[in-house]
Amino acid sequence: MIANGSVFKFGDNIDTDVIIPARYLNIADYKELATHCMEDIDDKFISKVKKGDIIVATKNFGCGSSREHAPIVIKESGVSCVIASTFARIFFRNSINIGLPILECEEAANNIDEGDNIEVDFSTGVIKNITKGKEYKAEPFPEFMQNIILNEGLINSIKANRG
């Protein structure tokens, strides 16, 4: 799987309450819920993001409350993947479980800027910054985790591999 898009850059400790504020968690429709993605840190995020765009952040992305809604709204907003120096463990697991591609790569996270166009190859872990002509290498996920992401999440992966 390869993702290509423009970067939205965030710093350290972007918590789940910033990704999707708790005041909206009563909204059951994920597309509608996604219209509030990142609004407390960038109130124009949802109007700027295009299908395929990529979030790049530094340390501890997705910290805070255990909230499956956080990776769901990122995915539903059109973001194709998230790259960070590190992820909070529960966000990491929730992202895989719902099929949101993520990669940890400190060098990429520290050197990619807002608006850069990047290409991410999840099978190899190669992250290419097309804008700057740079390349970074993340550790790709094992095949079984890549299959979960390709099947759009854990439940779909289990259904697809029954048999």
Swiss-Prot record:
EC number of the protein: 4.2.1.33
Keyword annotations: Amino-acid biosynthesis, Branched-chain amino acid biosynthesis, Leucine biosynthesis, Lyase
One Pfam family in the UniProt entry: Aconitase_C
Superkingdom field: Bacteria
InterPro entries, per the entry: Aconitase/3IPM_dehydase_swvl, AconitaseA/IPMdHydase_ssu_swvl, IPMI_Swivel, LeuD, LeuD/DmdB_bac, LeuD_type2/HacB/DmdB
Pathway connected to this protein: Amino-acid biosynthesis; L-leucine biosynthesis; L-leucine from 3-methyl-2-oxobutanoate: step 2/4
GO biological process, one term: L-leucine biosynthetic process
Record's catalysed reaction(s): (2R,3S)-3-isopropylmalate = (2S)-2-isopropylmalate
Coiled coil location: none
Broad EC category: lyase
Single annotated GO MF: 3-isopropylmalate dehydratase activity
Subunit structure: Heterodimer of LeuC and LeuD.
Function: Catalyzes the isomerization between 2-isopropylmalate and 3-isopropylmalate, via the formation of 2-isopropylmaleate.
Family in the record: Belongs to the LeuD family. LeuD type 2 subfamily.
PANTHER family, A to Z: 3-ISOPROPYLMALATE DEHYDRATASE SMALL SUBUNIT 1, 3-ISOPROPYLMALATE DEHYDRATASE SMALL SUBUNIT 2-RELATED-RELATED
The protein's name in its UniProt record: 3-isopropylmalate dehydratase small subunit
Encoding gene per record: leuD
